[in-house]
């Protein structure tokens, strides 16, 4: 009766989604095996109202629960942990008997299992058991008995790791499928491809193959997909049946057997008529981020979606558990720094202030692990700079930046006092001696490249800021991180990367994204040979195969649903290419599978992006994927080092002119940072002016400067500001007789 109440007219006017009646049978099955479990808890799985609804909705649902006496009297007997898992095979169906401890009793249930041998629970080396995770896995085991699961949790909190560990416990092979926004039903089930002779044929997608082979499918990012596309999966999830586009049908095992007996046909004959059985242990785990309460755009958890899965919410780790995880993963991290860092992070996570919460999002567990890895490797490093780097505080809006500084000061994380001294270039040297490279205090062995052609070599004048950035990059590079450089246009991101790879002697593959980049063009490049279309590997695939460094430029221009594909590549080393091949991380997974590309151990990715915000009109790449990469903010050089650099570009240009230019541009940049002018003038423009003056020394300064500023002369306000600033430093652009100001007597 509780369920029918929620499906009635009145509750839909309250804006509550309908209750999934179909899932009740499954829930009753679980409660039958575990009679001591609270009913309210099982209802949360079917109908996760605490994440779905705002405050009013929650109160309404809890009122209904009280009315039907389903609100238990506080005796919460929840499953504690999985005690043991044993494999059993009855007539070719692999199952496992799992013993789960609830309160003081142990209950044994049968669940479907995978085709591999089981690993003992908590045997996986990379997974650290904490109390809440043990409990979550035990609950997932209960749902796994009857239905498919959907894990909901914020980004970077370890959903994928839990799902992987769950699969290992039951001996499943995993088939990860990354979902993106413009995915069609065809991408999920079957795609067209062209045979060499020009015929078109259907190729089954990884999802269909997994259903036939009995794997565990991970649908990652189910909150992104269009709801209509997911409706295709409803039949597969509810009835375990599927009709494909080429006319073949997949049936549930028992129906397939009955059909076989009725028609007295063998398996081969049925396969000729394209009827296939779905493997009995096939299961789906969907991973999603929680819906945003109150917004209309992100309500992906609708009534038709609620019937498909059992929902488990993954809470963020409590402080003690997070310390446990970090300490076991990074054993020699300095204790004092770790305590400060965690108390700071949890304080940010618990505040009600929205700006502080947006900062906390960029300090996920994944990011904290990265910071502690660096601290354990370089213990004298400053914690303040590590946190500001993780949040990219250089490009935060002023409100958020001041909130960050205030919270850091409260947590007694201070700025290093030596940082205020102007560092000298002679302290930081880039030198290559007998096969090792030293940048500042960090040294690395030089790579022995097979392809000398692809090692970049550019004109680069050392200046202190760029060398400091490169030293920082080298630290992370040696820790095995993928790098992300964020900065305004023209500050020399490409130059720094090319110089960095030149010093390390690493070959480079280069790919530039744009607004129309799709997932297909990232992985394949079509070209025409002898009148036939031939698909060649894109630089991305080449870099993965040969172990080169992939430089992804303008990463913020591509739609974020495309760049999400990079996430699985960086994190798990897995990715499906547009022609059906797949990239895998370790060669152990290859045995007997064709169409597999193994990642070369030397493969790295360096991503370049502009800062999010107005004049660049990019997507917020940092917001969606920032916590996967190790981030570095690149800025214009300080006036002193910029002057040094310009002297090298224009040795014959008179010194006073260079000083005028540096001072004027310095002021224009600070105006851009305050938001008075839109376009942040960068080093690139000054260098171009100086190059011009070097080549044509007779031309007047004002006419050369106009090459850069003419674009803004149509906008009168901008023009006023520009002319005033340039006059201040004695660059006579657009001067009229009236602007000559005589000194007073």
Please describe what each predicted stretch is:
Residues 23, 157, 181-184, 224-225, ...:
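Conserved nucleotide-binding/hydrolysis micro-motifs of P-loop NTPases
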């Amino acid at each position: 009766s509780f369920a029918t109440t929620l499906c009635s007219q009145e509750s839909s006017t309250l804006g509550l989604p309908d209750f999934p009646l179909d899932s009740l049978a499954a829930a009753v099955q679980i409660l039958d095996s575990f009679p001591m479990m609270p009913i309210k808890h099982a209802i949360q799985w079917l109908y996760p109202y605490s994440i779905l609804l705002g405050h009013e909705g929650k109160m309404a649902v809890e009122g209904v629960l009280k009315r039907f006496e389903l609100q238990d009297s506080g005796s919460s007997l929840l499953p504690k942990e999985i005690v043991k898992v044993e494999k059993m095979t009855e007539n070719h169906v692999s199952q496992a008997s799992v013993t789960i401890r609830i309160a003081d009793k142990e209950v044994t249930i049968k669940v479907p299992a995978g085709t591999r041998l089981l690993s003992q629970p908590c045997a996986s080396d990379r997974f650290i058991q904490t109390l809440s995770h043990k409990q979550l896995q035990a609950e997932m085991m209960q749902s796994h008995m009857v239905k498919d699961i959907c894990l909901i949790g914020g980004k970077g909190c370890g959903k994928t790791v839990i799902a992987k560990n769950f699969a290992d416990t039951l001996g499943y092979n995993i088939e990860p499928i990354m979902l993106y926004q413009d995915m069609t039903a065809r991408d999920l089930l079957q795609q067209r491809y062209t045979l060499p002779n020009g015929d078109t044929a259907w190729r089954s997608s990884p999802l269909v193959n997994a259903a036939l082979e009995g794997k565990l499918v991970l649908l990652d990012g189910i909150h992104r997909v269009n709801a209509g596309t997911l409706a295709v999966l409803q039949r597969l999830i509810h009835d375990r049946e599927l009709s494909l586009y080429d006319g073949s049908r997949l049936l549930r095992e028992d129906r397939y057997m009955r059909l076989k007996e009725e028609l007295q046909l063998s398996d081969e004959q049925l396969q000729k008529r394209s009827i296939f059985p779905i493997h009995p242990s096939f299961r789906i785990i969907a991973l999603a981020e929680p819906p945003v309460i109150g917004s209309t755009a992100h309500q992906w958890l609708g009534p038709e979606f609620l019937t498909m899965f059992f929902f488990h919410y993954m809470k963020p780790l409590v402080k003690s558990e997070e310390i446990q995880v970090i300490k076991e993963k990074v054993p020699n991290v300095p204790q004092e720094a770790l305590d400060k860092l965690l108390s700071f992070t949890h304080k940010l996570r618990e505040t009600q202030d929205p700006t502080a919460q947006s900062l906390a999002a960029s300090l996920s567990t994944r990011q904290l692990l990265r910071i502690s890895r660096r601290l354990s490797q370089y213990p004298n490093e400053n914690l303040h700079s590590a946190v500001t780097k993780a949040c990219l505080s250089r490009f935060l809006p002023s409100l958020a930046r001041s909130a960050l500084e205030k919270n850091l000061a409260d947590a007694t994380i201070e700025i290093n006092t030596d940082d205020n001294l102007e560092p000298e270039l002679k302290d930081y040297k880039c030198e290559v001696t007998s096969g090792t490279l030293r940048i500042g205090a960090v040294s690395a062995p030089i790579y022995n490249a097979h392809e000398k052609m692809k090692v970049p070599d550019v004109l680069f004048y050392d200046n202190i800021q760029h060398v400091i950035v490169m030293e920082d990059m080298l630290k992370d590079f040696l820790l095995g991180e993928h790098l992300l450089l964020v900065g305004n246009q023209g500050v020399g991101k490409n130059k720094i990367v090319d110089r960095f790879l030149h010093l390390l002697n690493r070959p480079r593959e280069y790919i530039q994204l744009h607004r129309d980049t799709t997932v297909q063009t990232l992985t394949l490049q079509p070209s025409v040979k002898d009148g036939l279309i031939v698909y060649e590997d894109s630089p991305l695939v080449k870099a993965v195969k040969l172990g080169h460094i992939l430089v992804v430029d303008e990463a913020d221009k591509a739609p974020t649903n495309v760049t999400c594909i990079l996430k699985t590549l960086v994190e798990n080393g897995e990715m499906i290419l547009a022609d059906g091949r797949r990239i895998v991380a370790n060669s152990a997974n290859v045995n007997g599978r064709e169409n597999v590309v193994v990642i070369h151990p030397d493969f790295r990715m360096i991503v370049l992006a502009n800062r999010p915000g107005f004049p660049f009109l990019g997507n917020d790449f940092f917001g969606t994927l920032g916590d996967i990469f190790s981030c570095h903010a690149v800025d214009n050089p300080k006036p002193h080092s910029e002057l040094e650099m310009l002297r090298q570009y224009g040795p014959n240009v008179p010194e006073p002119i260079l000083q005028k230019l540096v001072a004027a541009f310095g002021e224009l940049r600070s105006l851009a940072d305050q938001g008075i002018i839109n376009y942040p003038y960068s080093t690139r423009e000054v260098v171009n002016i100086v190059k011009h003056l070097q080549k044509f020394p007779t031309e007047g300064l004002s006419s050369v400067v106009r090459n850069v500023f003419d674009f803004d002369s149509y906008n009168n306000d901008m023009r006023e500001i520009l002319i005033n600033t340039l006059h201040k430093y004695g660059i006579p652009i657009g001067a009229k007789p009236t602007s000559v100001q005589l000194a007073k007597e």
